[in-house]
C-alpha cells in the first residue's frame, strides 16, 4: 500500500478527473434553451454529430445528482486523508520524540539483523566442516 501523501495525490487527481467528467456530462447532455425571444438555436449539420445530446430532464437531473454525490464522496475521502497526515495535531517536540523512538526501534532491529547474520555465518562454517569431514571418509 502506498504512503498517505501518494494516496492523497491520487485522490486529488481522481477528483480532477471527476470534475472534468462532470463538466463533460453537463456540457454534452444539457437542454438547449434560449435566453430571449430573439435567440435561435442553430440546427446541427447533417454530416456532423450533434454537439449536444439532450437527455430528458429527469434522467439529466439523476445523472447530475449521482455525479455530485461522487464528487462529495471523493472530497470526503480527501478530507480524511488530510486529517490522517502526521503532524497536524502534534507539536514539533512530539514529532521529534516520535522520530527518536523510531530510531531506537531501527537500532534494535539492526542489532537483531546483525546477530542473525552472525548466526548464519556460524551455521555455514559448521556445515562446511561437517561436509569436509564426510568427504574424508
From Swiss-Prot:
Any single biological process term in GO: regulation of transcription by RNA polymerase II
GO cellular component: mediator complex
Coiled coil stretches, renumbered: 87-130
InterPro entries from the UniProt entry: Med7/Med21-like (IPR037212), Mediator_Med21 (IPR021384)
Record's subcellular location: Nucleus
Chief site of localization: nucleus
SUPFAM superfamilies associated with the record: Mediator hinge subcomplex-like
Region (Disordered): 37-56
Keywords, alphabetical: Activator, Coiled coil, Nucleus, Transcription, Transcription regulation
Keyword check for Secreted: no
The organism's place on the tree of life at top rank: Eukaryota
Gene Ontology molecular-function annotations: transcription coregulator activity
PANTHER family per UniProt: MEDIATOR OF RNA POLYMERASE II TRANSCRIPTION SUBUNIT 21, RNA POLYMERASE II HOLOENZYME COMPONENT SRB7
Family from the record: Belongs to the Mediator complex subunit 21 family.
Job of this protein: Component of the Mediator complex, a coactivator involved in the regulated transcription of nearly all RNA polymerase II-dependent genes. Mediator functions as a bridge to convey information from gene-specific regulatory proteins to the basal RNA polymerase II transcription machinery. Mediator is recruited to promoters by direct interactions with regulatory proteins and serves as a scaffold for the assembly of a functional preinitiation complex with RNA polymerase II and the general transcription factors.
Summary of subunit composition and partner proteins: Component of the Mediator complex.
Protein name, entry field: Mediator of RNA polymerase II transcription subunit 21
Lineage: Eukaryota, Fungi, Dikarya, Ascomycota, Pezizomycotina
Gene: srb-7
Amino acid at each position: 500500500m502506498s504512503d498517505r501523501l501518494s494516496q492523497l495525490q491520487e485522490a486529488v487527481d481522481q477528483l480532477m478527473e471527476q470534475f472534468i467528467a462532470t463538466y463533460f456530462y453537463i456540457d454534452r447532455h444539457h437542454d438547449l434553451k434560449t435566453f430571449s425571444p430573439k435567440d435561435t438555436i442553430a440546427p446541427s449539420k447533417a454530416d456532423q454529430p450533434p454537439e449536444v445530446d439532450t437527455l430528458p430532464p429527469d434522467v439529466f437531473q439523476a445523472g447530475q445528482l449521482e455525479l455530485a454525490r461522487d464528487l462529495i464522496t471523493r472530497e470526503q475521502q480527501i478530507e480524511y486523508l488530510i486529517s490522517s497526515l502526521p503532524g497536524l495535531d502534534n507539536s514539533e517536540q512530539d514529532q521529534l520524540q516520535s522520530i527518536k523512538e523510531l530510531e531506537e526501534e531501527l537500532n534494535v532491529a539492526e542489532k537483531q539483523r546483525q546477530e542473525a547474520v552472525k548466526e548464519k555465518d556460524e551455521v555455514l562454517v559448521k556445515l562446511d566442516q561437517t561436509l569436509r569431514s564426510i568427504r574424508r571418509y
